[in-house]
UniProtKB/Swiss-Prot annotation:
InterPro entries: ATP_PFK (IPR022953), ATP_PFK_prok-type (IPR012003), PFKA_ATP_prok (IPR012828), Phosphofructokinase_CS (IPR015912), Phosphofructokinase_dom (IPR000023), PKF_sf (IPR035966). It comes from Listeria welshimeri serovar 6b (strain ATCC 35897 / DSM 20650 / CCUG 15529 / CIP 8149 / NCTC 11857 / SLCC 5334 / V8). Keywords: Allosteric enzyme, ATP-binding, Cytoplasm, Glycolysis, Kinase, Magnesium, Metal-binding, Nucleotide-binding, Transferase. Its EC number is 2.7.1.11. This is ATP-dependent 6-phosphofructokinase. ADP binds at residues 21-25, 154, 185-187, 211, 213-215. Its cofactor is Mg(2+). The gene is pfkA. It is found in: Cytoplasm. The keyword ATP-binding applies. GO terms for biological process: canonical glycolysis; fructose 1,6-bisphosphate metabolic process; fructose 6-phosphate metabolic process. One of its GO terms (cellular component) is 6-phosphofructokinase complex. It holds the Pfam family PFK.
Protein backbone atom coordinates (compact mmCIF):
# COMPACT_ATOMS: atom_id res chain seq x y z
CA UNK A 1 0.00 0.00 0.00
CA UNK A 2 1.74 3.15 -1.24
CA UNK A 3 -1.00 5.44 -2.46
CA UNK A 4 -4.57 5.91 -1.23
CA UNK A 5 -7.48 8.16 -2.19
CA UNK A 6 -10.47 9.62 -0.36
CA UNK A 7 -13.89 10.83 -1.47
CA UNK A 8 -17.05 12.17 0.12
CA UNK A 9 -20.41 11.17 -1.27
CA UNK A 10 -24.12 11.86 -0.82
CA UNK A 11 -25.47 14.53 1.51
CA UNK A 12 -22.79 16.58 3.24
CA UNK A 13 -22.39 16.40 7.00
CA UNK A 14 -20.42 18.58 9.45
CA UNK A 15 -17.22 16.74 10.30
CA UNK A 16 -16.52 15.35 6.84
CA UNK A 17 -13.64 17.80 6.53
CA UNK A 18 -12.29 16.72 9.91
CA UNK A 19 -12.37 13.08 8.77
CA UNK A 20 -10.65 13.97 5.49
CA UNK A 21 -7.97 15.84 7.42
CA UNK A 22 -7.39 12.83 9.66
CA UNK A 23 -7.09 10.44 6.72
CA UNK A 24 -4.64 12.69 4.90
CA UNK A 25 -2.40 13.44 7.87
CA UNK A 26 -2.42 9.90 9.25
CA UNK A 27 -1.61 8.48 5.81
CA UNK A 28 1.25 10.91 5.20
CA UNK A 29 2.57 10.17 8.70
CA UNK A 30 2.64 6.49 7.72
CA UNK A 31 4.56 7.27 4.52
CA UNK A 32 1.66 7.07 2.05
CA UNK A 33 0.69 9.40 -0.77
CA UNK A 34 -2.88 10.67 -0.63
CA UNK A 35 -5.21 11.79 -3.40
CA UNK A 36 -8.54 13.55 -3.09
CA UNK A 37 -11.41 12.75 -5.44
CA UNK A 38 -13.75 15.66 -6.09
CA UNK A 39 -17.53 15.19 -6.36
CA UNK A 40 -17.71 11.66 -4.99
CA UNK A 41 -18.19 8.71 -7.32
CA UNK A 42 -18.98 11.08 -10.18
CA UNK A 43 -15.54 12.61 -9.84
CA UNK A 44 -14.00 9.15 -9.57
CA UNK A 45 -15.47 8.06 -12.90
CA UNK A 46 -14.46 11.35 -14.53
CA UNK A 47 -10.93 11.22 -13.12
CA UNK A 48 -11.31 14.44 -11.10
CA UNK A 49 -8.45 13.48 -8.79
CA UNK A 50 -5.79 15.64 -7.14
CA UNK A 51 -2.85 15.02 -4.85
CA UNK A 52 -3.26 16.18 -1.26
CA UNK A 53 -0.46 17.38 1.00
CA UNK A 54 -0.38 18.24 4.70
CA UNK A 55 -1.16 21.85 3.84
CA UNK A 56 -4.10 20.84 1.67
CA UNK A 57 -6.13 20.03 4.77
CA UNK A 58 -5.02 22.96 6.90
CA UNK A 59 -7.77 25.21 8.28
CA UNK A 60 -10.36 22.46 7.69
CA UNK A 61 -11.02 21.02 11.13
CA UNK A 62 -13.64 23.62 12.08
CA UNK A 63 -15.34 23.92 8.70
CA UNK A 64 -18.68 22.38 7.80
CA UNK A 65 -19.47 20.87 4.42
CA UNK A 66 -16.81 19.00 2.45
CA UNK A 67 -13.93 20.66 0.64
CA UNK A 68 -13.81 17.65 -1.70
CA UNK A 69 -17.39 18.50 -2.72
CA UNK A 70 -20.10 15.92 -3.11
CA UNK A 71 -22.52 14.72 -5.76
CA UNK A 72 -25.06 11.97 -6.19
CA UNK A 73 -24.19 9.55 -8.97
CA UNK A 74 -26.71 6.68 -9.18
CA UNK A 75 -24.99 5.39 -12.33
CA UNK A 76 -22.24 4.00 -10.11
CA UNK A 77 -24.66 1.19 -9.26
CA UNK A 78 -24.12 -0.12 -12.81
CA UNK A 79 -21.29 -2.39 -13.93
CA UNK A 80 -20.17 0.22 -16.43
CA UNK A 81 -19.88 2.90 -13.77
CA UNK A 82 -17.95 0.67 -11.38
CA UNK A 83 -15.50 -0.49 -14.05
CA UNK A 84 -14.84 3.11 -15.07
CA UNK A 85 -14.14 3.94 -11.45
CA UNK A 86 -11.65 1.11 -11.04
CA UNK A 87 -10.02 2.09 -14.32
CA UNK A 88 -9.38 5.58 -12.96
CA UNK A 89 -8.03 4.22 -9.68
CA UNK A 90 -5.58 2.00 -11.55
CA UNK A 91 -4.66 4.83 -13.91
CA UNK A 92 -3.62 6.95 -10.93
CA UNK A 93 -1.88 3.96 -9.31
CA UNK A 94 -4.10 4.15 -6.24
CA UNK A 95 -3.98 1.09 -3.98
CA UNK A 96 -6.81 1.80 -1.52
CA UNK A 97 -9.84 4.04 -1.12
CA UNK A 98 -11.66 5.68 1.80
CA UNK A 99 -15.32 6.59 1.26
CA UNK A 100 -17.11 8.99 3.62
CA UNK A 101 -20.89 9.05 3.41
CA UNK A 102 -24.15 7.32 4.17
CA UNK A 103 -26.03 4.28 2.97
CA UNK A 104 -25.67 5.03 -0.75
CA UNK A 105 -21.94 5.67 -0.35
CA UNK A 106 -21.56 2.34 1.42
CA UNK A 107 -23.20 0.57 -1.52
CA UNK A 108 -20.56 2.12 -3.78
CA UNK A 109 -17.78 1.07 -1.42
CA UNK A 110 -19.14 -2.47 -1.27
CA UNK A 111 -19.29 -2.64 -5.07
CA UNK A 112 -15.61 -1.72 -5.35
CA UNK A 113 -14.73 -4.26 -2.67
CA UNK A 114 -16.54 -7.02 -4.56
CA UNK A 115 -14.48 -6.12 -7.61
CA UNK A 116 -11.30 -6.60 -5.62
CA UNK A 117 -10.43 -3.02 -4.74
CA UNK A 118 -9.59 -2.35 -1.05
CA UNK A 119 -12.15 0.14 0.26
CA UNK A 120 -13.01 1.42 3.74
CA UNK A 121 -16.24 3.21 4.68
CA UNK A 122 -16.58 6.02 7.20
CA UNK A 123 -20.14 6.91 8.33
CA UNK A 124 -20.86 10.54 7.48
CA UNK A 125 -24.53 11.57 7.60
CA UNK A 126 -26.58 13.78 9.88
CA UNK A 127 -29.40 11.21 9.96
CA UNK A 128 -27.46 8.77 12.18
CA UNK A 129 -29.07 5.93 10.21
CA UNK A 130 -26.06 3.66 9.59
CA UNK A 131 -25.80 0.33 11.38
CA UNK A 132 -22.56 -0.75 13.01
CA UNK A 133 -22.02 2.50 14.88
CA UNK A 134 -23.66 4.37 17.73
CA UNK A 135 -23.12 7.71 16.02
CA UNK A 136 -22.38 8.96 12.52
CA UNK A 137 -20.24 11.99 11.74
CA UNK A 138 -22.45 15.07 11.56
CA UNK A 139 -25.30 13.85 13.73
CA UNK A 140 -24.20 15.62 16.90
CA UNK A 141 -23.75 18.92 15.08
CA UNK A 142 -27.14 18.66 13.38
CA UNK A 143 -28.71 17.74 16.70
CA UNK A 144 -27.30 20.85 18.35
CA UNK A 145 -28.43 23.01 15.42
CA UNK A 146 -31.99 21.73 15.85
CA UNK A 147 -31.85 22.11 19.62
CA UNK A 148 -30.72 25.72 19.32
CA UNK A 149 -33.66 26.45 17.01
CA UNK A 150 -36.08 24.59 19.27
CA UNK A 151 -35.01 26.59 22.31
CA UNK A 152 -35.53 29.86 20.44
CA UNK A 153 -38.90 28.78 19.07
CA UNK A 154 -40.01 27.85 22.58
CA UNK A 155 -39.29 31.43 23.67
CA UNK A 156 -41.76 32.82 21.16
CA UNK A 157 -44.21 29.95 21.73
CA UNK A 158 -44.26 30.89 25.40
CA UNK A 159 -44.69 34.58 24.68
CA UNK A 160 -47.68 34.04 22.39
CA UNK A 161 -49.09 30.92 24.07
CA UNK A 162 -49.00 28.92 20.86
CA UNK A 163 -48.31 25.45 19.57
CA UNK A 164 -45.34 25.16 17.24
CA UNK A 165 -44.46 22.30 14.92
CA UNK A 166 -40.81 21.88 13.99
CA UNK A 167 -40.10 19.75 10.91
CA UNK A 168 -36.63 18.17 10.94
CA UNK A 169 -34.71 15.96 8.55
CA UNK A 170 -35.09 12.20 8.74
CA UNK A 171 -36.68 10.47 5.78
CA UNK A 172 -36.38 6.97 7.18
CA UNK A 173 -34.77 7.55 10.57
CA UNK A 174 -36.09 9.58 13.48
CA UNK A 175 -32.89 10.07 15.46
CA UNK A 176 -32.70 13.83 14.92
CA UNK A 177 -36.34 14.24 15.94
CA UNK A 178 -36.00 11.95 18.95
CA UNK A 179 -32.78 13.31 20.39
CA UNK A 180 -33.62 16.97 19.79
CA UNK A 181 -37.15 16.48 21.08
CA UNK A 182 -35.89 14.82 24.24
CA UNK A 183 -33.18 17.42 24.81
CA UNK A 184 -35.57 20.28 24.10
CA UNK A 185 -38.52 18.99 26.11
CA UNK A 186 -40.91 18.65 23.16
CA UNK A 187 -44.47 17.74 24.08
CA UNK A 188 -44.66 15.24 21.21
CA UNK A 189 -42.10 13.57 18.94
CA UNK A 190 -43.22 12.04 15.63
CA UNK A 191 -40.79 9.61 13.96
CA UNK A 192 -40.96 7.17 11.01
CA UNK A 193 -40.18 4.13 13.16
CA UNK A 194 -43.15 4.59 15.50
CA UNK A 195 -46.78 4.81 14.44
CA UNK A 196 -48.73 7.67 15.95
CA UNK A 197 -52.36 8.51 16.52
CA UNK A 198 -53.45 12.14 16.28
CA UNK A 199 -56.03 11.51 18.99
CA UNK A 200 -53.19 10.60 21.36
CA UNK A 201 -51.23 13.72 20.41
CA UNK A 202 -54.25 15.95 21.03
CA UNK A 203 -54.99 14.17 24.31
CA UNK A 204 -51.43 14.88 25.45
CA UNK A 205 -51.76 18.56 24.50
CA UNK A 206 -55.14 18.83 26.22
CA UNK A 207 -53.79 17.37 29.44
CA UNK A 208 -51.03 19.94 29.34
CA UNK A 209 -53.57 22.71 29.00
CA UNK A 210 -55.61 21.37 31.90
CA UNK A 211 -52.66 21.79 34.24
CA UNK A 212 -51.87 25.29 33.01
CA UNK A 213 -49.45 24.75 30.13
CA UNK A 214 -50.13 27.42 27.50
CA UNK A 215 -47.66 26.48 24.78
CA UNK A 216 -46.30 23.31 23.22
CA UNK A 217 -43.65 22.07 20.81
CA UNK A 218 -44.10 19.12 18.45
CA UNK A 219 -41.09 17.77 16.54
CA UNK A 220 -41.93 15.94 13.30
CA UNK A 221 -39.46 13.96 11.19
CA UNK A 222 -39.97 14.73 7.49
CA UNK A 223 -40.31 11.04 6.67
CA UNK A 224 -43.64 10.85 8.48
CA UNK A 225 -45.24 13.85 6.81
CA UNK A 226 -44.52 17.51 6.27
CA UNK A 227 -44.90 19.91 9.14
CA UNK A 228 -47.61 21.76 7.23
CA UNK A 229 -49.62 18.59 6.67
CA UNK A 230 -49.30 17.71 10.35
CA UNK A 231 -50.54 21.19 11.29
CA UNK A 232 -53.47 20.79 8.91
CA UNK A 233 -54.50 17.51 10.50
CA UNK A 234 -54.00 18.88 14.01
CA UNK A 235 -56.27 21.85 13.23
CA UNK A 236 -59.15 19.46 12.59
CA UNK A 237 -59.15 18.63 16.30
CA UNK A 238 -60.26 22.02 17.61
CA UNK A 239 -58.38 25.23 18.24
CA UNK A 240 -54.84 23.94 17.74
CA UNK A 241 -53.81 26.30 14.96
CA UNK A 242 -50.10 25.61 15.08
CA UNK A 243 -47.26 27.58 13.55
CA UNK A 244 -44.81 25.55 11.47
CA UNK A 245 -41.03 25.89 11.20
CA UNK A 246 -39.21 23.83 8.57
CA UNK A 247 -35.52 23.78 9.44
CA UNK A 248 -34.41 22.22 6.16
CA UNK A 249 -30.80 22.31 5.02
CA UNK A 250 -29.60 24.50 7.87
CA UNK A 251 -29.29 21.16 9.70
CA UNK A 252 -26.48 20.09 7.37
CA UNK A 253 -24.33 23.17 7.78
CA UNK A 254 -22.26 24.81 10.46
CA UNK A 255 -19.00 24.25 12.26
CA UNK A 256 -18.84 20.70 13.65
CA UNK A 257 -19.12 20.20 17.40
CA UNK A 258 -16.18 18.99 19.46
CA UNK A 259 -17.77 15.53 19.54
CA UNK A 260 -18.00 15.34 15.75
CA UNK A 261 -14.44 16.61 15.29
CA UNK A 262 -13.02 14.02 17.66
CA UNK A 263 -15.17 11.22 16.24
CA UNK A 264 -14.16 12.11 12.68
CA UNK A 265 -10.48 12.22 13.65
CA UNK A 266 -10.62 8.81 15.31
CA UNK A 267 -12.54 7.16 12.48
CA UNK A 268 -10.35 8.70 9.77
CA UNK A 269 -7.13 7.51 11.40
CA UNK A 270 -8.51 4.00 11.89
CA UNK A 271 -9.56 3.81 8.23
CA UNK A 272 -5.94 4.37 7.19
CA UNK A 273 -4.73 1.71 9.62
CA UNK A 274 -7.13 -0.84 8.13
CA UNK A 275 -5.87 -0.17 4.62
CA UNK A 276 -2.29 -0.58 5.82
CA UNK A 277 -3.36 -3.92 7.30
CA UNK A 278 -4.81 -4.88 3.88
CA UNK A 279 -8.28 -5.19 5.41
CA UNK A 280 -10.62 -3.76 2.80
CA UNK A 281 -14.38 -4.14 2.67
CA UNK A 282 -14.87 -2.76 6.18
CA UNK A 283 -16.61 0.24 7.69
CA UNK A 284 -15.43 1.91 10.86
CA UNK A 285 -17.74 3.04 13.65
CA UNK A 286 -17.96 3.73 17.34
CA UNK A 287 -19.56 1.49 19.97
CA UNK A 288 -19.54 2.46 23.65
CA UNK A 289 -16.73 4.93 22.85
CA UNK A 290 -14.57 2.23 21.25
CA UNK A 291 -13.64 2.32 17.56
CA UNK A 292 -14.88 -0.80 15.80
CA UNK A 293 -15.00 -2.12 12.28
CA UNK A 294 -17.60 -4.27 10.53
CA UNK A 295 -18.08 -5.82 7.12
CA UNK A 296 -19.75 -3.28 4.84
CA UNK A 297 -22.01 -5.91 3.31
CA UNK A 298 -23.26 -6.97 6.72
CA UNK A 299 -23.91 -3.37 7.73
CA UNK A 300 -25.99 -2.81 4.61
CA UNK A 301 -28.09 -5.87 5.45
CA UNK A 302 -28.90 -4.53 8.91
CA UNK A 303 -31.64 -1.97 9.37
CA UNK A 304 -30.92 0.93 11.67
CA UNK A 305 -33.26 0.86 14.65
CA UNK A 306 -34.50 3.66 16.84
CA UNK A 307 -33.49 3.58 20.50
CA UNK A 308 -36.80 2.37 21.95
CA UNK A 309 -35.84 3.08 25.56
CA UNK A 310 -34.93 6.64 24.66
CA UNK A 311 -38.23 7.09 22.81
CA UNK A 312 -40.18 5.76 25.79
CA UNK A 313 -38.23 8.05 28.13
CA UNK A 314 -39.02 11.07 25.97
CA UNK A 315 -42.71 10.18 26.12
CA UNK A 316 -42.63 9.89 29.92
CA UNK A 317 -40.75 13.15 30.47
CA UNK A 318 -42.94 15.17 28.11
CA UNK A 319 -46.09 14.67 30.22
Amino acid sequence: MKRIAILTSGGDAPGMNAATRAVVRKAIYEGLEVYGINYGFLGLVNGDIRKLELGSVGDLLHRGGTFLYSARYPEFATEEGQLKGIEQLKKHQIDGLVVIGGDGSYHGAEALTKRGFPTIGIPGTIDNDISGTDFTIGFDTALNTVLDALDKIRDTATSHERTFIIEVMGRDAGDIALWSGLAGGAEAIIVPEESFNMDDVVDRLNKGRERGKKHSIIVVAEGVMSGNEFAKQLAEYGDYHARVTVLGHVQRGGSPTAFDRVLASRLGARAVELLLENRGGLAVGIRENRIVENNIGEILKEKHTLDQKLFDLASILSI
